[in-house]
């Protein structure tokens, strides 16, 4: 097995942040002690140079993290059907179903989007993020449905990654949340960082968190719930889930950030990535792609419209 390589681009708002602190926020599956060892061993470079843990970012650097590969099962192509929205020589956009993990990780080495892409695209996937994440430039949570883009070559990958870094990509999500809204629209501007009590969770962190902005618009109000559209200005891990919970509107079905009771039996959060738009890396044209609400989501909305209030 080869080493796992991950590439990150520091954002302007990261200026002045120590590299070890930055990485502890970005690498959710890597402990602080391992980050320190990676730095000490020269496995983390900033613009091609090894740095110490006290290095402070300028906010524009390319950061490469090389993690020596643990003994894990070989990642193999799998003939898993994909709901392809669009495909060309540079990108492929798919409508990801609920329950499917985007890339292999501990406990999920088969049945992922990556396994399916490796079969469908063969060797035509970008290699920037290493053997565990070929083609993957962004991701959505396992129980979030909807549109994601994968890249077939490194040029396209770098281009899309740069657009993500400057927040120029259009990303609209749809979700059902607890409680009715009084306002028709609004913005949550609250920094997000790792939950100090559980690194697998995120939390609003006004002292050490990274800038996170979510714009929301109420589409329908029901008795105890609301159907809303959320547009991401930034793209932090679990951003919509954390932001909605922070203002008293946790997402229905979210078993991590929602503590409100519901009679609906759901597999995770009722959250759908409905719209993704970006400048095409080869043509320079803006393209926008949509994924329809999944069947379970439509049935839930129908029940709420008929007066359901579980």
Predicted regions and their residues:
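Conserved hydrophobic positions within beta-strands
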Residues: 84, 177, 215-218, 251
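Conserved "cap/hinge" positions at secondary-structure junctions
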Residues: 48, 67, 242, 260-261
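RNA pseudouridine synthases
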Residues: 1-187, 191, 295-304
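Short alpha-helix capping/helix-loop boundary micro-motifs
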Residues: 47-53, 224-227, 262
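The conserved catalytic core of RNA pseudouridine synthases
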Residues: 130-162, 170, 174, 189-247, ...
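A general beta-strand register signal
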Residues: 45, 85-86, 206, 265, ...
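Short, surface-exposed secondary-structure edge patches
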Residues: 52-56, 229, 268
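Short, surface-exposed loop/helix-turn segments at secondary-structure junctions
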Residues: 203, 253-265
């Amino acid at each position: 097995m080869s080493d796992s390589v991950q590439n990150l681009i520091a954002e302007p708002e990261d200026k002045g942040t120590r590299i070890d602190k930055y990485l502890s926020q970005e690498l959710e599956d890597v402990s602080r002690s391992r980050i320190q060892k990676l730095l000490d061993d020269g496995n983390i470079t900033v613009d091609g140079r090894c740095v110490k843990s006290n290095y402070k970012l300028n906010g524009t650097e390319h950061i490469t993290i090389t993690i020596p590969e643990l003994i894990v099962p070989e990642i193999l192509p799998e003939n898993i059907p994909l709901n392809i929205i669009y495909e060309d020589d540079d990108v492929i956009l798919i409508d990801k179903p609920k329950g499917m993990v985007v890339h292999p990780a501990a406990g999920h080495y088969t049945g992922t989007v990556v396994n399916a892409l490796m079969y469908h695209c063969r060797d035509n996937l970008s290699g920037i993020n290493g053997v565990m994440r070929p083609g993957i430039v962004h991701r959505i949570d396992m129980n979030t449905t909807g549109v994601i883009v994968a890249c077939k070559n490194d040029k396209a990958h770098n281009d899309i990654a740069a657009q993500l870094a400057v927040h120029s990509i259009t990303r609209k999500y749809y979700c059902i949340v607890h409680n009715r809204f009084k306002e028709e629209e609004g913005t949550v501007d609250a920094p997000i960082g790792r939950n100090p009590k559980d690194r697998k969770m995120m939390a609003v962190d006004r002292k050490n968190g990274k800038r996170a902005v979510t714009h929301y618009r109420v589409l329908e109000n029901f008795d105890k719930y609301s159907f809303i559209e959320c547009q991401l200005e930034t793209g932090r891990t679990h951003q919509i889930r954390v932001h909605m919970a922070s203002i008293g509107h946790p997402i229905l079905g979210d078993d991590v950030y929602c503590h409100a009771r519901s009679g609906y039996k759901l597999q995770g959060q009722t959250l759908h990535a409905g719209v993704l738009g970006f400048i095409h890396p080869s043509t320079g044209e803006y393209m926008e792609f949509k994924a329809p609400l999944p069947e379970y989501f439509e049935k839930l909305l129908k029940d709420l419209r008929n007066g359901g209030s579980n």
